[in-house]
Protein backbone atom coordinates (compact mmCIF):
# COMPACT_ATOMS: atom_id res chain seq x y z
CA UNK A 1 0.00 0.00 0.00
CA UNK A 2 1.37 3.42 -0.92
CA UNK A 3 1.11 6.19 1.65
CA UNK A 4 -0.07 9.76 1.14
CA UNK A 5 3.54 10.85 1.71
CA UNK A 6 4.73 8.66 -1.15
CA UNK A 7 2.07 10.11 -3.44
CA UNK A 8 3.06 13.63 -2.40
CA UNK A 9 6.65 12.78 -3.30
CA UNK A 10 5.53 12.25 -6.88
CA UNK A 11 4.71 8.53 -7.03
CA UNK A 12 1.61 8.23 -9.22
CA UNK A 13 -0.40 5.08 -9.68
CA UNK A 14 -3.81 6.64 -10.12
CA UNK A 15 -5.16 9.14 -12.64
CA UNK A 16 -8.86 9.82 -12.08
CA UNK A 17 -10.89 11.24 -14.93
CA UNK A 18 -11.50 14.97 -15.07
CA UNK A 19 -14.69 15.26 -17.10
CA UNK A 20 -15.07 18.52 -18.98
CA UNK A 21 -18.06 19.59 -21.05
CA UNK A 22 -18.10 23.37 -20.69
CA UNK A 23 -15.90 26.36 -19.92
CA UNK A 24 -16.55 26.63 -16.19
CA UNK A 25 -12.92 27.27 -15.31
CA UNK A 26 -13.67 27.81 -11.63
CA UNK A 27 -15.29 24.39 -11.24
CA UNK A 28 -12.56 22.67 -13.27
CA UNK A 29 -9.86 24.28 -11.14
CA UNK A 30 -11.64 23.27 -7.95
CA UNK A 31 -11.92 19.65 -9.13
CA UNK A 32 -8.21 19.54 -9.94
CA UNK A 33 -7.43 20.79 -6.43
CA UNK A 34 -9.65 18.08 -4.92
CA UNK A 35 -7.85 15.42 -6.95
CA UNK A 36 -4.55 16.70 -5.57
CA UNK A 37 -5.91 16.70 -2.02
CA UNK A 38 -6.97 13.05 -2.45
CA UNK A 39 -3.34 12.03 -2.89
CA UNK A 40 -3.33 11.67 -6.67
CA UNK A 41 -0.69 13.61 -8.53
CA UNK A 42 -2.12 12.95 -11.98
CA UNK A 43 -5.47 13.04 -13.76
CA UNK A 44 -6.87 12.26 -17.18
CA UNK A 45 -8.87 14.91 -19.03
CA UNK A 46 -11.96 13.52 -20.75
CA UNK A 47 -14.29 15.34 -23.13
CA UNK A 48 -17.83 14.32 -22.11
CA UNK A 49 -18.77 15.70 -24.69
CA UNK A 50 -16.96 18.97 -25.31
CA UNK A 51 -18.41 19.99 -28.66
CA UNK A 52 -15.44 22.15 -29.64
CA UNK A 53 -12.90 19.42 -28.92
CA UNK A 54 -9.61 20.49 -30.54
CA UNK A 55 -11.18 23.85 -31.39
CA UNK A 56 -10.29 27.33 -30.15
CA UNK A 57 -12.24 27.11 -26.87
CA UNK A 58 -10.84 23.66 -26.18
CA UNK A 59 -7.27 24.92 -26.37
CA UNK A 60 -8.06 27.79 -23.99
CA UNK A 61 -9.50 25.33 -21.49
CA UNK A 62 -6.60 22.89 -21.90
CA UNK A 63 -4.12 25.74 -21.42
CA UNK A 64 -5.85 26.51 -18.13
CA UNK A 65 -5.88 22.85 -17.08
CA UNK A 66 -2.20 22.28 -17.89
CA UNK A 67 -1.24 25.54 -16.17
CA UNK A 68 -3.22 24.61 -13.07
CA UNK A 69 -1.64 21.16 -12.98
CA UNK A 70 1.85 22.59 -13.28
CA UNK A 71 1.19 24.96 -10.39
CA UNK A 72 0.26 21.92 -8.28
CA UNK A 73 3.12 19.77 -9.62
CA UNK A 74 0.69 17.31 -11.20
CA UNK A 75 0.73 15.32 -14.44
CA UNK A 76 -1.94 15.58 -17.14
CA UNK A 77 -3.17 12.73 -19.32
CA UNK A 78 -5.76 13.00 -22.09
CA UNK A 79 -8.48 10.58 -23.13
CA UNK A 80 -7.62 10.52 -26.79
CA UNK A 81 -10.90 11.28 -28.57
CA UNK A 82 -13.87 13.60 -28.53
CA UNK A 83 -16.07 11.03 -26.83
CA UNK A 84 -16.13 7.48 -25.52
CA UNK A 85 -15.14 5.03 -26.94
CA UNK A 86 -11.82 5.84 -28.58
CA UNK A 87 -12.10 5.38 -32.32
CA UNK A 88 -14.00 8.28 -33.84
CA UNK A 89 -10.77 10.21 -34.42
CA UNK A 90 -12.62 13.47 -33.70
CA UNK A 91 -14.84 12.92 -36.73
CA UNK A 92 -11.98 12.34 -39.18
CA UNK A 93 -13.35 8.99 -40.36
CA UNK A 94 -16.51 10.68 -41.62
CA UNK A 95 -14.32 12.96 -43.72
CA UNK A 96 -12.33 9.98 -45.02
CA UNK A 97 -14.94 7.35 -45.89
CA UNK A 98 -12.38 5.20 -47.72
CA UNK A 99 -10.82 4.47 -44.31
CA UNK A 100 -14.00 3.22 -42.65
CA UNK A 101 -13.86 -0.38 -41.37
CA UNK A 102 -15.00 -3.23 -43.57
CA UNK A 103 -17.03 -6.19 -42.39
CA UNK A 104 -18.18 -9.51 -43.78
CA UNK A 105 -21.71 -10.76 -43.21
CA UNK A 106 -23.39 -13.99 -44.23
CA UNK A 107 -26.92 -14.30 -45.57
CA UNK A 108 -28.15 -17.89 -45.42
CA UNK A 109 -31.06 -19.97 -46.63
CA UNK A 110 -31.74 -23.65 -45.95
CA UNK A 111 -32.71 -25.80 -48.94
CA UNK A 112 -33.98 -29.37 -49.24
CA UNK A 113 -32.68 -31.36 -52.19
CA UNK A 114 -32.87 -32.66 -54.76
CA UNK A 115 -32.93 -29.38 -56.65
CA UNK A 116 -32.40 -29.09 -60.38
CA UNK A 117 -31.84 -25.75 -62.03
CA UNK A 118 -32.81 -24.07 -58.80
CA UNK A 119 -32.54 -20.36 -58.19
CA UNK A 120 -31.86 -18.67 -54.86
CA UNK A 121 -32.41 -14.92 -54.62
CA UNK A 122 -29.58 -13.50 -52.53
CA UNK A 123 -30.08 -10.57 -50.20
CA UNK A 124 -28.42 -7.48 -51.64
CA UNK A 125 -27.14 -4.46 -49.73
CA UNK A 126 -26.47 -1.00 -51.14
CA UNK A 127 -23.07 -0.79 -49.47
CA UNK A 128 -21.93 -4.37 -50.09
CA UNK A 129 -20.28 -6.57 -52.69
CA UNK A 130 -20.36 -10.34 -52.87
CA UNK A 131 -17.22 -12.06 -51.58
CA UNK A 132 -18.27 -15.66 -52.08
CA UNK A 133 -21.15 -18.11 -52.02
CA UNK A 134 -20.84 -21.62 -50.64
CA UNK A 135 -23.07 -24.60 -49.89
CA UNK A 136 -22.95 -26.72 -46.74
CA UNK A 137 -24.53 -30.17 -46.34
CA UNK A 138 -26.41 -30.56 -43.06
CA UNK A 139 -25.29 -33.55 -40.97
CA UNK A 140 -27.11 -32.87 -37.72
CA UNK A 141 -28.72 -30.16 -35.62
CA UNK A 142 -26.83 -27.07 -36.86
CA UNK A 143 -23.79 -29.17 -37.87
CA UNK A 144 -22.51 -29.36 -41.43
CA UNK A 145 -19.98 -30.66 -43.88
CA UNK A 146 -18.47 -28.39 -46.49
CA UNK A 147 -20.05 -29.10 -49.88
CA UNK A 148 -18.68 -26.64 -52.43
CA UNK A 149 -17.97 -23.05 -53.49
CA UNK A 150 -20.71 -21.79 -55.83
CA UNK A 151 -19.58 -18.20 -56.27
CA UNK A 152 -19.25 -18.70 -60.03
CA UNK A 153 -22.91 -19.69 -60.15
CA UNK A 154 -24.10 -16.24 -59.04
CA UNK A 155 -25.51 -14.13 -61.88
CA UNK A 156 -26.28 -10.41 -61.84
CA UNK A 157 -24.89 -10.26 -58.32
CA UNK A 158 -28.15 -11.40 -56.75
CA UNK A 159 -29.29 -14.76 -58.14
CA UNK A 160 -27.63 -18.09 -57.42
CA UNK A 161 -28.28 -20.90 -59.88
CA UNK A 162 -27.63 -24.25 -58.28
CA UNK A 163 -28.22 -27.99 -58.61
CA UNK A 164 -28.29 -30.03 -55.41
CA UNK A 165 -28.62 -33.78 -54.74
CA UNK A 166 -30.86 -35.45 -52.16
CA UNK A 167 -30.37 -34.04 -48.67
CA UNK A 168 -30.52 -30.88 -46.60
CA UNK A 169 -28.27 -27.95 -47.44
CA UNK A 170 -27.46 -24.43 -46.33
CA UNK A 171 -26.66 -21.85 -49.00
CA UNK A 172 -24.46 -19.03 -47.68
CA UNK A 173 -23.71 -15.75 -49.43
CA UNK A 174 -20.90 -13.75 -47.81
CA UNK A 175 -20.68 -10.03 -48.55
CA UNK A 176 -18.13 -7.34 -47.72
CA UNK A 177 -19.76 -4.16 -46.44
CA UNK A 178 -19.20 -1.07 -44.36
CA UNK A 179 -21.23 -0.38 -41.27
CA UNK A 180 -21.69 1.74 -38.19
CA UNK A 181 -21.85 0.81 -34.56
CA UNK A 182 -23.93 2.73 -32.04
CA UNK A 183 -21.07 5.12 -31.35
CA UNK A 184 -20.85 6.40 -34.91
CA UNK A 185 -18.25 5.99 -37.63
CA UNK A 186 -15.11 4.40 -36.20
CA UNK A 187 -11.55 3.86 -37.39
CA UNK A 188 -10.59 0.54 -38.93
CA UNK A 189 -8.47 -1.33 -36.41
CA UNK A 190 -7.08 -3.52 -39.21
CA UNK A 191 -5.75 -0.53 -41.16
CA UNK A 192 -2.63 1.38 -40.20
CA UNK A 193 -3.70 4.35 -42.33
CA UNK A 194 -7.11 4.51 -40.67
CA UNK A 195 -5.64 4.44 -37.15
CA UNK A 196 -3.22 7.17 -38.23
CA UNK A 197 -6.23 9.51 -38.44
CA UNK A 198 -6.39 9.43 -34.64
CA UNK A 199 -2.75 10.46 -34.37
CA UNK A 200 -3.14 13.29 -36.87
CA UNK A 201 -6.37 14.60 -35.36
CA UNK A 202 -5.67 14.30 -31.63
CA UNK A 203 -2.14 13.23 -30.75
CA UNK A 204 -0.12 15.55 -32.96
CA UNK A 205 -1.83 18.84 -32.03
CA UNK A 206 -1.74 18.14 -28.29
CA UNK A 207 1.90 17.10 -28.40
CA UNK A 208 2.84 20.18 -30.42
CA UNK A 209 1.13 22.49 -27.94
CA UNK A 210 2.17 20.87 -24.66
CA UNK A 211 5.59 19.41 -25.36
CA UNK A 212 7.88 20.11 -22.42
CA UNK A 213 5.03 20.71 -19.96
CA UNK A 214 3.45 18.41 -17.40
CA UNK A 215 1.52 16.70 -20.19
CA UNK A 216 2.20 13.01 -19.60
CA UNK A 217 0.47 11.04 -22.33
CA UNK A 218 -2.70 9.57 -23.82
CA UNK A 219 -5.29 7.08 -22.66
CA UNK A 220 -7.50 5.04 -25.04
CA UNK A 221 -10.89 4.25 -23.54
CA UNK A 222 -12.33 0.88 -24.58
CA UNK A 223 -11.19 0.89 -28.22
CA UNK A 224 -12.78 -2.01 -30.04
CA UNK A 225 -13.47 -3.68 -33.34
CA UNK A 226 -17.03 -2.39 -33.12
CA UNK A 227 -18.56 -5.37 -34.88
CA UNK A 228 -22.00 -6.45 -33.85
CA UNK A 229 -25.10 -8.03 -35.30
CA UNK A 230 -25.65 -6.64 -38.78
CA UNK A 231 -29.07 -5.46 -39.94
CA UNK A 232 -28.01 -2.71 -42.33
CA UNK A 233 -26.21 -1.03 -39.45
CA UNK A 234 -24.30 -2.51 -36.56
CA UNK A 235 -25.90 -2.28 -33.14
CA UNK A 236 -24.78 -2.94 -29.61
CA UNK A 237 -26.20 -6.46 -29.40
CA UNK A 238 -22.94 -8.17 -30.29
CA UNK A 239 -20.32 -5.47 -29.82
CA UNK A 240 -19.13 -6.65 -26.41
CA UNK A 241 -20.24 -10.26 -26.31
CA UNK A 242 -20.06 -11.65 -29.82
CA UNK A 243 -18.53 -15.09 -30.30
CA UNK A 244 -17.41 -16.96 -33.38
CA UNK A 245 -20.34 -18.93 -34.73
CA UNK A 246 -22.96 -16.42 -33.62
CA UNK A 247 -25.70 -15.95 -36.20
CA UNK A 248 -25.79 -12.55 -37.87
CA UNK A 249 -22.46 -11.40 -36.48
CA UNK A 250 -20.44 -9.06 -38.68
CA UNK A 251 -16.71 -9.86 -38.75
CA UNK A 252 -13.99 -7.29 -39.40
CA UNK A 253 -12.36 -7.70 -42.78
CA UNK A 254 -9.44 -6.57 -44.93
CA UNK A 255 -8.88 -7.04 -48.64
CA UNK A 256 -5.98 -9.44 -48.11
CA UNK A 257 -7.59 -11.40 -45.28
CA UNK A 258 -8.37 -14.39 -47.50
CA UNK A 259 -4.71 -14.77 -48.45
CA UNK A 260 -3.71 -14.54 -44.79
CA UNK A 261 -6.19 -17.23 -43.80
CA UNK A 262 -4.83 -19.48 -46.55
CA UNK A 263 -1.37 -19.15 -45.01
CA UNK A 264 -2.57 -19.75 -41.46
CA UNK A 265 -5.19 -22.49 -41.97
CA UNK A 266 -3.95 -25.56 -43.90
CA UNK A 267 -6.28 -26.48 -46.75
CA UNK A 268 -8.19 -23.19 -46.57
CA UNK A 269 -10.21 -22.16 -49.59
CA UNK A 270 -12.43 -19.14 -50.15
CA UNK A 271 -15.75 -20.80 -49.33
CA UNK A 272 -14.47 -21.98 -45.95
CA UNK A 273 -15.09 -18.48 -44.61
CA UNK A 274 -18.72 -19.51 -43.97
CA UNK A 275 -17.43 -21.61 -41.07
CA UNK A 276 -17.12 -18.40 -39.05
CA UNK A 277 -20.92 -18.59 -38.67
CA UNK A 278 -21.51 -22.33 -39.00
CA UNK A 279 -20.14 -25.45 -37.33
CA UNK A 280 -18.44 -27.17 -40.26
CA UNK A 281 -16.71 -30.48 -39.57
CA UNK A 282 -12.95 -30.34 -40.04
CA UNK A 283 -13.04 -26.66 -41.04
CA UNK A 284 -14.47 -24.33 -38.38
CA UNK A 285 -11.84 -24.77 -35.68
CA UNK A 286 -8.90 -24.05 -37.97
CA UNK A 287 -10.54 -21.09 -39.71
CA UNK A 288 -11.74 -19.46 -36.50
CA UNK A 289 -8.37 -19.75 -34.79
CA UNK A 290 -6.59 -18.45 -37.89
CA UNK A 291 -9.01 -15.55 -38.21
CA UNK A 292 -8.73 -14.52 -34.56
CA UNK A 293 -4.94 -14.81 -34.62
CA UNK A 294 -4.75 -12.60 -37.69
CA UNK A 295 -7.06 -9.82 -36.54
CA UNK A 296 -5.41 -9.84 -33.09
CA UNK A 297 -2.00 -9.42 -34.71
CA UNK A 298 -3.25 -6.56 -36.86
CA UNK A 299 -4.96 -4.86 -33.94
CA UNK A 300 -1.73 -5.02 -31.97
CA UNK A 301 0.41 -3.68 -34.78
CA UNK A 302 -1.91 -1.07 -36.24
CA UNK A 303 -3.65 0.29 -33.15
CA UNK A 304 -1.92 -0.37 -29.84
CA UNK A 305 1.51 -0.80 -31.41
CA UNK A 306 1.33 2.27 -33.62
CA UNK A 307 0.01 4.57 -30.88
CA UNK A 308 2.41 3.38 -28.19
CA UNK A 309 5.41 3.58 -30.54
CA UNK A 310 4.46 7.13 -31.51
CA UNK A 311 4.28 8.07 -27.82
CA UNK A 312 7.56 6.38 -26.87
CA UNK A 313 9.42 8.18 -29.64
CA UNK A 314 8.35 11.49 -28.09
CA UNK A 315 8.87 10.62 -24.45
CA UNK A 316 5.15 10.29 -23.75
CA UNK A 317 3.24 7.59 -21.90
CA UNK A 318 0.44 5.52 -23.41
CA UNK A 319 -2.20 3.44 -21.61
CA UNK A 320 -5.43 1.75 -22.57
CA UNK A 321 -7.99 -0.84 -21.65
CA UNK A 322 -9.40 -2.82 -24.52
CA UNK A 323 -12.76 -4.39 -25.27
Residue ranges and their predicted role:
Residues 1-6, 13, 27-37, 55-289:
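Mature extracytoplasmic enzyme cores
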Residues 16, 20-47:
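N-terminal cofactor/phosphate-binding cores enriched in small/glycine residues
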Residues 19-21, 185-186, 293-295:
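Second-shell loop/turn segments in exported
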Residues 19-27, 48-60, 323:
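Acidic-and-aromatic substrate-binding clefts and catalytic sites of carbohydrate-active enzymes
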Residues 76-87, 216-222, 292-323:
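Aromatic-lined carbohydrate-recognition surfaces of secreted/lumenal glycan-active proteins
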Amino acid sequence: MFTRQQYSAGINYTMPFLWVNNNDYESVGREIEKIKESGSNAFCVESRIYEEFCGAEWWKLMDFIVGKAESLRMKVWLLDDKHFPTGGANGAVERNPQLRPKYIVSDEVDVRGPVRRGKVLLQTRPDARLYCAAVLRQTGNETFEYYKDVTDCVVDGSTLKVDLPQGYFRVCAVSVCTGYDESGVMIDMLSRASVRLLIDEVYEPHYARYKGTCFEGFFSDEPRFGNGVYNGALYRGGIYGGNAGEKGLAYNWAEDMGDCLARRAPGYERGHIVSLWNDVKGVSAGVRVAYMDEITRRYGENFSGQLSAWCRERGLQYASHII
